[in-house]
Amino acid sequence: MKKYIGIFAAMLLCALLALSAFAAETVVYVNDGGTGDGSSASAPLGNMTEAISKVANGGKVVIVDTYTCAEEYREPTHKGDIIVTGGKYVFTNGAYNRWFLGGPGATTFENITFEYGAGSTSLFLAQYFPLNFGEGVVTPSEGKAYVVGGYQYADSVPLNDEPRYDADSHITIKSGTYWAVSGFSRGGSMEEYTGTSHITVNGGTISTVYGAAINGSYALNCEIIINDGNVQNV
């Protein structure tokens, strides 16, 4: 009996240790001018790429107060799912207020405010990686925010890669205000997409949802699920 009790206790300890490791989420902090190691709100990093790299296996990046980006932003690759949250993210590039996902893990924005320090348009380009706008996302009340499941232009790929017409996209919207949500691309082309765009709307306000592309192009398959929110056109 003692032997079995010992085995059970060892198994229980292993399970508890595994659960503890699973529950310990990696959190990194970042803001304008940060000079710390990112381990706390009082010691934030000053660079978003460095912050995301620290949670590449999965975790959360917390903006403390404000983070300003003067260039179009491209995430580093991250195997795990990441959450970008807190504070305010300010686009100041003007002509190229863009955020490109790096994948392959999902990127989720939640409880965050986006503002324009220059320009009046922003684009979130998923590049076929999962993109989620969770609860508490505030987008600029003036101007236009676009969410694109694939690329800006199908034939103008920002990565060293061939254009992808057979990939699936995954977008979920729970909050925020958007001028357009597009399953595959924004720019004009006459390509036919053979993948499936998956767009789920659980909240927020969207002027138009496009299953394929905003300007031209066609898709064989798209799945648009509207559970809640205000979608004016599909």
Regions found by a protein language model. Name each.
Residues 31-64:
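Acidic Gly/Asp/Thr-rich repetitive segments characteristic of extracellular carbohydrate-active
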Residues 30-31, 64, 85, 182, ...:
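Residue-level detector of conserved, well-ordered beta-strand and adjacent loop positions
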Residues 56-57, 77-83, 98-182, 186-208, ...:
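Surface-exposed loop/turn motifs in large extracellular/passenger domains
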Residues 18-26:
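Sec-dependent signal peptide cleavage junction
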Residues 10-11, 21:
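Cleavable N-terminal signal peptides
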Residues 1-6:
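Positively charged n-region of N-terminal signal peptides that target proteins for export
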Residues 59-82, 86-97, 119:
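N-terminal extracellular ligand-recognition/capping segment immediately after the signal peptide
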